[in-house]
Curated annotation (Swiss-Prot):
One GO cellular component term: nucleus
KW Oxidoreductase (keyword) present: no
Disordered: annotated span: 90-157, 232-254, 314-389, 425-479, 528-552
InterPro entries: Gti1/Pac2
Molecular function terms from GO: DNA binding
Stated name of the protein: Transcriptional regulator MIT1
Family: Belongs to the MIT1/WOR1 family.
Low complexity composition-biased segments: 90-104, 233-254, 334-384, 460-476
Pfam families: Gti1_Pac2
Gene: MIT1
């Protein structure tokens, strides 16, 4: 796998380092997964190359580049190295051997020099001062101080040091990450030449248009402040009104645990000096620790980063869970609510058995029509497409990008690992097992994959109207109360050939959300007692006449302004994500990572329903978005602040995820 520099430019000071690190954590820039190979060094280890690597992800403990460097010296929070002129190393060595014993061993970074008889000690005198007429924006004082600082008082000599002019500048930051206070070691290794700085050839991150909207988080600023090397002083030359001034506290409140960046630029624009995050081509595994909920003896897949919540190019999105892939997350079997309802389920076992027969009969009918449904899977003109724009997928894998089926990525929004279900990380999901107590997985057929779809906990999902789905009208589904807020398996309807009876299944995943009560008439969640003729979006009652697909009565919404709930979105929940510090936004902790995901491209439009009413997003909590009409996102604001609302339009593929801090319309 080829690697590229994270950024092309010059790290002048800590402010620049913060911008580079934050952009990497946001997914705007990419960190590198390995050291450069020897064949890559000639074009990677050059002036202007800036590399960021995360020690826990890349496994890089020691950076090697094959260059002979002087001993390090401290400049603020940075370490500075100068490349030695190998052609003159012999003469320097000879002179040193007859001189003082105060010397330093110079290696080429590959440990080979230590075993090479021709390698010898070189006495290093103070570095020659370099005075350049640099423009203020290029940090004259900062660069000058780097050139003025001597290596060590003991290295002073009249012997001139031969070096090429290439300089290596490094910095490391220890970042503590919630929820387990794990430590990530972030490293920056940058290269520049004295000539390029003199001629103003390299741009600083502060001056880069690509990074103009990046704001270092408070956690990162604190971590940088805790990095101490020598007598540290702030070399920042940014003004108080600069777009990237990290000392502007109003601009530094965005926590690292938010998915949404404040970048207004499209993430796939190849702006000068930028490289975007690209997904790794291999799956990393590591031995997890007890704090994550896994036993020490159990292996779990390593996250790309506990801080890279979202990777912008290309993003990976799950399609329908498929029995041949690791997306069949049967969380319902471990749900506490299922256990709590076992007694009632057992009492109704006779009724369940009767319903099972109906399920089996209906499934037989459905299976007979499977081929008709799957023949046109992925075709936007398919008359059997579900009303919710979902399709039935078969075992051959009707994925948007089938050639990428083996490629795995982890778009984690939080680092919370599902501690109750290690099966999240199995390479082969467990086969559905018939459960007579809960009516789950009835009539499972190996001839066609029947996927575990999850319904919205506060919606009827047409449970009482759809063929094959059991449960009493309006108040229960699969003999479990709808208001119990648990994922329900709509197994019987997955492959129904009739779109009229296929409104239930949604290939969605849950996340825990604190749902604020909005006082807007377009609110998605209204109190039950507000079901009046003047409020068409109020939560309706649980009467039998409740319209299919609308919310049922839920006492949890009636008595609390902020109620914990589980809300389900299809694929990407980012459009509802915002800063956890913004009380007017959804506040959530993503609890269910997506183990197997597939890249999404233009053909994703084929599985979208373009007929959504523009005003329905506020009243439709099941409104599943990849990219919908721009007005949908305007309406989603529902009267509250527009900050950090994700803005996705029809012109975007998921490679073009944007946020807009000023407005959500285009």
């Amino acid at each position: 796998m080829d690697i590229e520099p994270t950024f092309k430019g010059y790290i002048e000071d800590e402010d620049d380092a913060l911008l580079i690190l934050q952009a990497t954590l946001d997914g705007k820039l990419k960190h590198i997964p390995r050291r450069p190979y020897e064949i890559e060094r000639p074009y990677l280890i050059v002036s202007g190359s800036i590399f960021v690597f995360i020690e826990e992800i890349s496994g890089i403990k020691r950076w090697t580049d094959g260059v002979s460097w002087s001993p390090s010296r401290i400049s603020g929070k940075f370490l500075i190295y100068k490349e030695l002129d190998k052609e003159n190393a012999g003469s320097n060595a000879n002179a040193t051997s007859s001189g003082s014993t105060d010397s330093a061993v110079i290696t080429d970074g590959t440990s080979g020099a230590r075993n090479n008889p021709s390698s010898s000690k070189i006495k290093l005198p103070p570095l020659k001062n370099h005075q350049f007429d640099l423009p203020p924006t290029m940090g004259h004082s900062s660069f000058e101080s780097e050139q003025d600082t001597s290596i060590s008082p003991s290295n002073r000599s009249n012997l001139p040091l031969k070096y090429t002019g290439l300089v290596k500048k490094t910095i490391s930051v220890k970042l503590k990450r919630p929820p387990f206070n794990s430590i990530e070691n972030l490293h920056i290794v940058s290269y520049y030449s004295v000539k390029d700085i003199k001629q103003n050839c390299l741009v600083t991150p502060k001056a880069s248009p690509f990074l103009k909207d990046v704001r270092p988080s408070q956690e990162l600023i604190v971590a940088m402040g805790n990095t101490t090397l020598g007598n540290v002083k702030n070399n920042s030359t940014t003004t108080g009104n600069g777009p990237n001034n990290i000392n502007n506290k109003s601009n530094s409140s965005t926590p690292l645990n938010t998915v949404i960046s404040t970048n207004n630029n499209s993430a796939n624009i190849n702006a000068a000096g930028s490289n975007q995050f690209t997904s790794a081509n291999k799956n990393y595994y590591y031995k997890n620790d007890e704090s994550s909920g896994y036993p020490i003896t159990q292996f779990a897949p390593a996250l790309p980063s506990t801080t890279l919540m979202y990777t912008a190019n290309p993003p990976y999105i799950t399609q329908s869970p498929d029995n041949t892939n690791a997306t069949g997350m049967n969380t319902h079997v471990n749900n506490n609510n299922n256990n709590s309802n076992n007694s009632s389920n057992s009492n109704n076992s006779n009724n369940n058995n009767n319903n099972n027969n109906n399920n089996n009969n209906n499934n037989n009918n459905n299976i007979n029509n499977i081929n008709n449904v799957n023949t046109n899977a992925g075709n936007g003109n398919n008359p059997n497409r579900f009303h919710n724009a979902s399709f039935a997928y078969n075992t051959t894998g009707d994925f948007i990008n089938p050639q990428q089926q083996g490629q795995i990525s982890y778009p984690f929004y939080y680092t919370t690992i599902p501690i109750n279900n290690p099966n999240y990380y199995t390479t082969q999901p467990p086969n559905p097992v018939t459960n007579a107590s809960t009516n789950e997985n009835q009539g499972y057929s190996t001839s066609s994959t029947q996927h575990p779809y999850y319904g919205h906990p506060t919606e009827s999902q047409s449970a009482s109207a759809a063929a094959g789905a059991t449960g009493t009208p309006g108040t229960a589904e699969n003999v479990l109360p709808v208001s119990s807020m648990q994922p329900l398996l709509h197994q019987a309807n997955n492959n129904s050939a009739s779109s009229a009876t296929s409104t239930a299944p949604y290939p969605v995943y849950s996340m825990n959300v604190n749902v604020p009560y909005y006082n807007s008439s377009a609110s998605a969640y209204k109190r039950a007692q507000e079901n009046t003729t003047s409020n068409t979006n109020a939560e309706p009652s649980g009467a039998t006449s409740t319209n299919s697909g609308t919310m049922l009565s839920n006492p949890a919404y009636a008595n609390s302004q902020y109620t914990p709930s589980q809300v389900y979105y299809q694929g990407f929940p980012q459009y509802a994500m915002a800063s956890a510090q913004n009380p007017s936004m959804y506040q959530h902790q993503h609890q269910h990572p997506l183990p197997t995901v597939y890249p999404i491209a233009t053909p994703q439009q084929n599985i979208m329903s373009s007929g959504h009413t523009l005003s329905t997003i506020g009243s439709d909590p099941q409104h599943h978005h990849y990219q919908q009409e721009p007005n949908d996102h305007k309406n989603f604001a529902m009267g509250h602040a527009n900050n950090n609302i994700l803005n996705i339009t029809n012109n975007d593929t998921m490679n073009n995820l944007n946020t807009n801090t000023s407005t959500t319309t285009q």
